[in-house]
Amino acid sequence: MADERTDVEIALAKEGRLLKKLTRLHEEQNLLYQQNIHDIFYEKTLEFESASEKLTLNARTIPVVTGRPSAQMDVELIMEKEIPVEMGFTEQGWFQLRMPMLLPQKGKGGSQYIRGFLYPAMMRFMRNDQRALRYKECILIYRHVYSRTYDERKYRDHDNIELNMVTDTVAVRVMADDSPMLCRHYYCSAVGDNERTEVYVIPRSDFFKWLEMEDHIPESGLKVENNPSIFGQ
């Protein structure tokens, strides 16, 4: 039998189920943590994170399915405010992207979550800066910054982090070609006051210069200037 509920009713029902699940997981996490059952507690934190991602995606859907013409724009404005993505070109002529969170693990629905806020941010950036910059032979760098309060045992393996959506979004803007022959990848982790993900695209010839600067990158990021040097044109 076909579901005769409206899209809004379906989304609200899903929201209710996810909220109940999150409440249950929250209670289980508290109990496990108090009892020092750390391995199972950690698994529950991952379940909670996964359900939270689904709830966020569903929450973005509800305003849109109401049919109001301004809904998509209104949702994007909220994301812009609540998930402040920073991007631009540094004084060295490097592309820099900063996101105020660690990227989710693979297989947790993270690609949709990332696309939801990163793609609109990239579109805004391209509207404001329309220079045709394309790095040819380049290095794509991911720097995962963990909060000083984060348990080192929970640092993520680099090959278990959802990167593809970010790479694809960045490639459209600043890479002539993201094939392995022209674009090499480098991954590293660091400790900071607040967790975040930093992405850089730099000319291959500048890699050792970036490595020398890496330990001294400020919490606020490398300074972005209005008229950077253009490489690879």
Where are these regions (language model features)?
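N-terminal targeting/trafficking signals and adjacent low-complexity tails
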Residues: M1-R68, Q72, T90-W94
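Long, charge-patterned amphipathic interaction tracts in eukaryotic proteins
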Residues: V75-P84
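Short amphipathic
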Residues: P84-L103, I141-Y146
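Short glycine/proline-enriched loop/turn "hinge" motifs that connect secondary-structure elements
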Residues: M87-E91, Q130-K136, V191
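C-terminal edge-of-domain segments
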Residues: S179-G232
